């Protein structure tokens, strides 16, 4: 039995009232008794300070300086010390019987802050005979002693043999030593742990149920599952590292793409410029040769152009002299044509206007008659409308008067007045003063007859008016015709003049008939004259071109000679044309073939490059497509074998991973179902109980238990019998062992140990022989050893798998390269070299071009002679038909004679044309000019007077008719008849009024209609008169203008004038055309000469410059080639397919690559500077330097441990394969690292169940504790509802939330926090991050709620709160909980410390007088049962039956304050035994 460590004594040195006092501590209860201020709290403060020397925690509330402003800094410690060095030391003896003295040196720090300096220390190996006071004091004499400083104490202890002194700079180290030596129950690693320990001591010191303790019971009682947390942290760290590695791989892949892009663009940039310079060098050589050939050709052309210029200048001078006379003749002919055209247009206008005037004259006469008729009709309509208006007004007046009279019974008087009024009006109009109603009817007949007579007379005058008007218009028309022909004349002379004009018109018409024959004759003669002049001009021109004068008789012989020459030259030209066509056709065929080959050459070169790459990659040479396909089949077989081997290694690696994963399960359970069953049965796995077995014992225990090594240990087998019924989800063999998991041993079997084997006697008739396994996995150490060996094996397998994966991917990429080659290049890769064929065809093309140039020169001379002969024949063909015209000399005189006769005939034709129509109209009406009708005006006046008379007669007849109608109004018989008559009269008046109003409406409508019609007729008449007058004036003006022109306008004059003008224009145009041709040719010749001269100068300059450039470029090109060959990059740069691109295409390719390179090297200062220098077009070697720098830059970044090549291109290919393999491997590793949510829930549930069982065991120790009415105390541990829901979801519904746990963006902790928020949206998470919340959720303690309950009196179990308990009950309950906490700490620390140490247990209790005797006795009993030490402070002696009691009395002696201490050991029947060291009072003395 391991003895528990004990505190032996407490020593106070130089404290307030205690100079050198040692309190021996009882093994159970030490009581400090005394009044107020006796020093009880100081003694306990010294103990606590030595136990927890942390000034941030120490705070002694029972201080004499309460309320002081510096109290917050003092914390109650400064006032308990004396000036100088102070000590507080604890003398302990642990379970190993080692004496350890731990303590602190305290010293007040001068200043206003009242600070205290604390230095912890420890002393080991001190003999039991040495007292603590002897160590730190030095006796000066009988009455004086001195306190040693810490340095002096160290020196003193160094002199003692076997004594170790340790001074600590950190409280953590101090507490670590105390924990290791069994002085404190818990390892205090941090300030948080020290705070918990201090709160525990403080809670016990002041008694009661501490709220700080009860609120944090989980932290005090439940141990931190650091292993699980660390496992999760390691898992997340591994996942994070894995993801960072994947991200780094992605970055590396991006860098690989960047490097690949850099190589590609750098190659395009430099190779395009390299090939462009190579092409330009070849082009410059060709240009230099072309310049030299063109220079010689241009000199020949210049000499020929100079000869040609002299001939054209002479001919141009002759044409300039002839152009002046032709221009004058052409201008005269143009003017004459314009006059003739003007006269013809004038004549046409005159004829058109005369026809218009005749038509207007007829329309004007007709319109006059229409207007006259319309005016008469208008007068009648006006009279009818006035009469209708008067009648309506009269009837309305009568009807109105009648209505008024009818209303006042005076109708008769009104009607009589109306009749009188009508009678008076009739008298006035008819001039009949004696008119009566009786005679009105007779007068009505008379006036109606008068109206009829006036109407008849008006009609008679209207007929006479019409006849007179017709005669008058005929005379006027004839008179106007005579005046138009002869001009103004008297009306009396019109007859004579008209007859003379008719006789003259007959003669003029006869002459006019001869115009057309004369004109045709003249036109014929003029045409012959012009042909004669043209023949003379052609003859002169022909003689000029031939260079000699020819007679007319010699022309036919010359024509035959030229035709013979043309025939001979034509054969030569045609044969030359065929020969030239054949040469050109062959040249075109060659050019087409070369173009076809040039188009095929890049494809062939690309195929060759691809074939060379394949040959380099596989180390084989291919000469035919069959060899390529055969090698591809070999690749497929090799790839299949590698894949099979890789899959075998991968399967073994996966098996190792699965075994590692199985062995890494917590508790050593190889089957997850065992954990669930253990939780279900309330048991513990046997492997978990033996988890701490050593590696040496693992084979023995593995053989001992054999197949039952995975059994479940349950407290009672009988209680789970029912649960075994229907159990299916379990291993095939499930072993159950009955036993206490807390104190399980291997006594369940009878076993005999043999050599490397055991014999287990399971029953009397059943034994089991088991050998020790060579690879035991029973116990954590064995599993870790096995896991370590498996990890080593896995590393070897991983390396082999990586190598095989690399080989497989390399083979696959090679297979893909062969497949691409077969699909893209196989058809052309093994064809003949097109470049060699191009060189051969180019040589033949040069020969053809030379032959064509020679042929063209010879053919040009023959063609020139042929053209000259054809031109001479053409001129003679135009001359020979006109030889008879050249001999006719009287042609010009005949033309002049016919011209005079034509002029006379044209003058007569113009007279007939001008006045022929007027004469034809005058001839039938000339007889009306003999008499002039002057009585027309008198007839018009008579007609108007008759019209007025008819209107007056009509009005008189209407007035008399009204009187006759009103005759009934003049007499009435009586009033009744009058009323009856009135009614009839009223009706008649209304009917007449309606008829009169209708008649008035019709009259008004007719009046308006006829008025509009009359207005329209009048307007038309005015328009016709105006148009007639205007056209008459225009006709007179046109006739005067025609006379002013002075040209006879006949039908053939315009044609002759136009023909003459056109002939002159043709001659002038031909002359000008020839002159322009000569001028242009001369200008062109001069320009050509100037261009040739300038071209010669330029060619000479270009030729010399090109020669210099070729020579200079040759030197630069040699330097470039030397640099390319020295650096071994010619294969990369000399890309033959680029030779077929133009300079612009290559420059564009280089510029595009340059733009991409600027972006690619923007972050690399060295490459950026080299690239900037390489942009100089005059220094092509700098581009080579840049390309070399890029390759060197990439070579430096090749990891030679992974990639074994110096070529960056090959390195990139290998890097791509390696990165792909790493990505695949890391992705699978991430999937294996990720823990399932079900596993997390099981781990947390299992931990919670284990801790609940542990708390249940701790509760058993509290069942017998009672204080006052408190019969028992217990702890309740419950799982929070929200967290229980989380566990359920994690274990059973995890599929619904895979979006969280499968996310690569979230760690497991963050996913867990997101799930918790999703399940509990009502909970505010504050400002905490998901990672922090997730880490809290991985701690099982946050899932539990703990509370203290007491069984008090009749109330039963209640929640332990200070308000529900008495002071003594609260103190006892709190002490019980603190004891439980200490015991829990010890259990937790047992795994961290040696099992041979049982730590000290000590608690405090201040003001213990508040407890009754029973409670004190219970405390004593609790301390005895739990082997716990207790220090109690009380004002009065509490009379303990056991333990040690110190009586403290503070006294003043000689102005010096000190505490008098008396110690007693228990109260027994015998006298109390005086404890050693307490017989004399403690007399303080000043330190020297």
UniProtKB/Swiss-Prot annotation:
Chain intervals with Basic and acidic residues compositional bias: 1051-1065
Region spans: Flexible hinge: 666-783
Coiled coil (UniProt feature): 326-418, 444-472, 509-602, 835-923, 977-1116, 1209-1265
Pfam families per the UniProt record, alphabetical: MukB (PF04310), MukB_hinge (PF16330), SbcC_Walker_B (PF13558)
Residues annotated to bind ATP: 34-41
One GO term (biological process): cell division
Keywords: ATP-binding, Cell cycle, Cell division, Chromosome partition, Coiled coil, Cytoplasm, DNA condensation, DNA-binding, Nucleotide-binding
Region feature Disordered, mapped onto this chain: 1049-1074
Highest rank taxon of the organism: Bacteria
Family: Belongs to the SMC family. MukB subfamily.
Function: Plays a central role in chromosome condensation, segregation and cell cycle progression. Functions as a homodimer, which is essential for chromosome partition. Involved in negative DNA supercoiling in vivo, and by this means organize and compact chromosomes. May achieve or facilitate chromosome segregation by condensation DNA from both sides of a centrally located replisome during cell division.
Assembly, per entry: Homodimerization via its hinge domain. Binds to DNA via its C-terminal region. Interacts, and probably forms a ternary complex, with MukE and MukF via its C-terminal region. The complex formation is stimulated by calcium or magnesium. Interacts with tubulin-related protein FtsZ.
Listed name of the protein: Chromosome partition protein MukB
Gene designation: mukB
């Amino acid at each position: 039995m391991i003895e528990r460590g004990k505190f032996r004594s407490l020593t106070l040195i130089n404290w307030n009232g205690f100079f050198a006092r040692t309190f021996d501590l009882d093994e159970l209860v030490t009581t400090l008794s005394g009044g107020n201020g006796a020093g009880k709290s100081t003694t306990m403060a010294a103990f606590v300070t030595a136990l927890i020397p942390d000034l941030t925690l120490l705070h002694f509330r029972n201080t004499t300086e309460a309320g002081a402003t510096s109290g917050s800094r003092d914390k109650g410690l400064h006032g308990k010390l004396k000036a100088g060095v102070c000590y507080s030391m604890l003398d302990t003896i642990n379970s190993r019987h080692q004496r350890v003295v731990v303590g602190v040196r305290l010293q007040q720090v001068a200043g206003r802050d009242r600070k205290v300096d604390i230095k912890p220390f420890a002393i080991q190996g001190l003999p039991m005979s040495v007292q603590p006071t002897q160590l730190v004091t030095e006796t000066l004499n009988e009455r004086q002693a001195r306190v040693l400083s810490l340095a002096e104490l160290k020196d003193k202890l160094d002199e003692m043999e076997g004594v170790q002194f340790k001074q600590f700079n950190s409280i953590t180290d101090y507490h670590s030593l105390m924990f290791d030596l069994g002085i404190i129950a818990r390892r205090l690693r941090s300030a948080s742990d020290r705070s918990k320990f201090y709160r525990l001591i403080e809670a016990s010191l002041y008694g009661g149920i501490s709220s700080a303790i009860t609120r944090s019971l989980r932290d005090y009682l439940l141990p931190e599952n650091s292993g699980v947390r660390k496992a999760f942290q390691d898992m997340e760290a591994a996942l994070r590292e894995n993801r960072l590695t994947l991200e780094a791989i992605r970055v590396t892949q991006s860098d690989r793409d960047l490097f690949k892009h850099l190589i590609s663009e750098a190659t395009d940039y430099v190779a395009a410029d390299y090939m462009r310079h190579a092409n330009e060098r070849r082009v410059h050589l060709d240009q230099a040769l072309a310049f030299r050939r063109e220079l010689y050709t241009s000199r020949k052309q210049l000499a020929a152009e100079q000869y040609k210029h002299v001939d054209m200048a002479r001919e141009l001078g002759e044409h300039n002299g002839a152009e002046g006379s032709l221009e004058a003749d052409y201008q005269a002919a143009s003017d004459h044509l314009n006059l003739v055209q003007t006269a013809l247009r004038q004549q046409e206008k005159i004829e058109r206007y005369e026809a218009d005037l005749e038509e207007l004259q007829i329309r004007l006469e007709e319109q006059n008659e229409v207007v006259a008729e319309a005016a008469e009709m208008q007068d009648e309509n006006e009279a009818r409308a006035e009469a209708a208006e008067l009648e309506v007004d009269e009837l309305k007046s009568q009807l109105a008067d009648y209505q008024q009279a009818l209303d006042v019974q005076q109708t008769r008087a009104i009607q009589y007045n109306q009749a009188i009024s009508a009678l008076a009006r009739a008298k006035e109009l008819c001039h009949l003063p004696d008119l009566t109603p009786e005679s009105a009817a007779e007068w009505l007949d008379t006036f109606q007859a008068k109206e009829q007579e006036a109407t008849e007379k008006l009609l008679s005058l209207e007929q006479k008016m019409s006849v007179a008007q017709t005669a008058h218009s005929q005379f006027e028309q004839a008179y106007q015709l005579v005046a138009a022909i002869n001009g103004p004349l008297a009306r009396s002379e019109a007859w004579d003049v008209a007859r003379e004009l008719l006789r003259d018109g007959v003669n003029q018409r006869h002459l006019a008939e001869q115009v057309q024959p004369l004109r045709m004759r003249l036109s014929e003669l003029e045409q012959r004259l012009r042909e004669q002049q043209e023949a003379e001009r052609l003859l002169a021109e022909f003689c000029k071109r031939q260079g000699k004068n020819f007679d007319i008789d010699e022309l036919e012989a010359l024509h035959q000679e030229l035709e013979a020459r043309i025939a001979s030259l034509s054969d030569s030209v045609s044969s030359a044309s065929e020969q030239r066509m054949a040469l050109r056709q062959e040249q075109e065929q060659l050019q087409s073939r070369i173009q076809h080959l040039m188009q095929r050459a890049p494809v062939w070169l690309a195929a060759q490059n691809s074939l060379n790459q394949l040959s380099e990659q596989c180390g084989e040479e291919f000469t035919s497509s069959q060899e390529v396909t055969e090698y591809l089949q070999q690749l497929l077989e090799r790839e299949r074998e590698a894949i099979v081997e890789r899959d075998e290694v991968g399967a073994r690696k996966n098996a190792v991973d699965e075994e590692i994963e199985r062995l890494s399960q917590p508790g050593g359970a190889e089957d997850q179902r065992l954990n669930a069953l253990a939780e279900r049965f309330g048991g513990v796995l046997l492997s978990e109980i033996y988890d701490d077995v050593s590696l040496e014992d693992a084979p023995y225990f593995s053989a001992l238990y054999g197949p039952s090594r995975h059994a479940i240990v349950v407290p009672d087998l009988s209680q789970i019998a029912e649960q075994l019924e229907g159990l299916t989800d379990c291993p095939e063999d499930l072993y159950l062992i009955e036993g206490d998991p807390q104190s399980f041993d291997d006594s369940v079997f009878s076993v005999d140990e043999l050599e490397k084997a055991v014999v287990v006697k399971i029953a009397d008739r059943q034994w089991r022989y088991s050998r020790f396994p060579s690879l035991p996995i029973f116990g954590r150490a064995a599993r870790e050893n096995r896991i370590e060996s498996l990890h080593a094996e896995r590393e070897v397998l991983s390396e082999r798998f990586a190598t095989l994966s690399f080989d497989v991917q390399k083979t696959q990429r090679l297979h893909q390269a062969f497949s691409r080659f077969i699909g893209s290049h196989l058809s052309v890769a093994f064809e003949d070299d097109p470049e060699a064929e191009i060189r051969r065809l180019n040589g033949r093309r040069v020969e053809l071009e030379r032959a064509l140039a020679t042929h063209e020169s010879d053919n040009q001379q023959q063609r020139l002679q042929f053209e000259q002969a054809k031109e001479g024949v053409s001129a003679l063909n135009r001359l020979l038909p006109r030889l008879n015209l050249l001999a006719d000399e009287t042609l010009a005189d005949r033309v002049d004679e016919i011209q005079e006769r034509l002029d006379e005939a044209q003058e007569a034709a113009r007279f007939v044309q001008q006045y022929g129509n007027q004469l034809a109209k005058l001839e039938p009406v000339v007889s009306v000019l003999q008499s002039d009708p002057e009585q027309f005006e008198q007839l018009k006046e008579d007609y108007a007077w008759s019209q007025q008379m008819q209107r007056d007669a009509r009005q008189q007849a209407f007035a008399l008719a009204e009187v006759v109608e009103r005759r009934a109004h003049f007499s009435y018989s009586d009033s009744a008849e009058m009323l009856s008559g009135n009614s009839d009269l009223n009706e008649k008046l209304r009917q007449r009024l309606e008829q009169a109003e209708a008649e008035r409406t019709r009259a008004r409508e007719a009046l308006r209609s006829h008025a509009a019609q009359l207005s329209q007729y009048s307007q038309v008449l005015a328009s016709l008169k105006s148009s007639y007058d205007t056209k008459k004036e225009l006709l007179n003006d046109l006739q005067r203008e025609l006379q002013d022109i002075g040209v006879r306008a006949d039908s053939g004059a315009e044609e002759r004038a136009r023909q003459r003008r056109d002939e002159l224009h043709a001659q002038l145009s031909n002359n000008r055309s020839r002159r322009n041709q000569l001028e242009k040719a001369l200008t062109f010749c001069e320009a050509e000469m100037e261009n040739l001269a300038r071209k010669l100068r330029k060619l000479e300059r270009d030729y010399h410059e090109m020669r210099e450039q070729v020579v200079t470029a040759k030197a630069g090109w040699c330097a470039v080639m030397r640099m390319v060959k020295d650096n071994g990059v010619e294969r990369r740069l000399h890309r033959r397919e680029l030779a077929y691109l133009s300079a612009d295409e290559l420059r564009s390719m280089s510029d595009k690559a340059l733009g991409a390179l600027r972006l690619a090297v923007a972050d690399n200062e060295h490459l950026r500077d080299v690239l900037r220098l390489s942009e100089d077009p005059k220094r092509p070697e700098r581009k080579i330097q840049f390309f070399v720098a890029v390759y060197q830059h990439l070579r430096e970044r090749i990891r030679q441990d992974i990639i074994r090549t110096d070529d960056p291109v090959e390195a990139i290919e290998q890097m791509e394969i390696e990165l792909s393999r790493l990505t695949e491997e890391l992705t699978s590793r991430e999937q294996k690292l990720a823990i399932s949510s079900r596993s997390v829930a099981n781990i947390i549930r299992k931990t919670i169940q284990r801790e609940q069982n542990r708390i249940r065991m701790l509760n058993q120790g509290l069942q017998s504790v009672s204080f006052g009415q408190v019969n028992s105390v217990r702890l309740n541990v419950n799982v929070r509802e929200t967290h229980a829901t989380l566990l359920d979801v994690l274990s059973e519904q995890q599929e619904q939330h895979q979006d969280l746990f499968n996310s690569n963006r979230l760690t497991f902790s963050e996913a867990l926090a997101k799930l918790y928020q999703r399940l509990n949206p009502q909970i505010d998470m504050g400002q905490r991050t998901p990672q922090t919340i997730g880490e809290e959720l991985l701690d099982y303690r946050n899932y539990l709620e703990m509370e203290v309950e007491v069984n008090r009196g009749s109330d039963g179990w209640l929640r332990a709160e200070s308000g529900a308990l008495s002071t003594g009950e609260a103190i006892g309950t709190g002490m019980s909980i603190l004891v439980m906490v200490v015991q829990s700490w010890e259990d937790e620390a047992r795994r961290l410390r040696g099992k041979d140490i049982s730590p000290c247990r000590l608690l405090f209790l201040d003001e213990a007088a508040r407890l009754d005797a029973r409670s004190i006795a219970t405390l004593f009993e609790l301390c005895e049962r739990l082997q716990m030490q207790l220090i109690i402070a009380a004002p009065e002696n509490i009379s303990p039956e056991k333990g040690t009691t110190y009586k403290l009395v503070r006294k003043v002696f000689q102005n010096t304050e000190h505490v008098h201490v008396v110690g007693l050991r228990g109260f027994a029947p015998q006298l109390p035994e005086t404890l050693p060291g307490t017989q004399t009072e403690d007399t303080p003395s000043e330190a020297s």
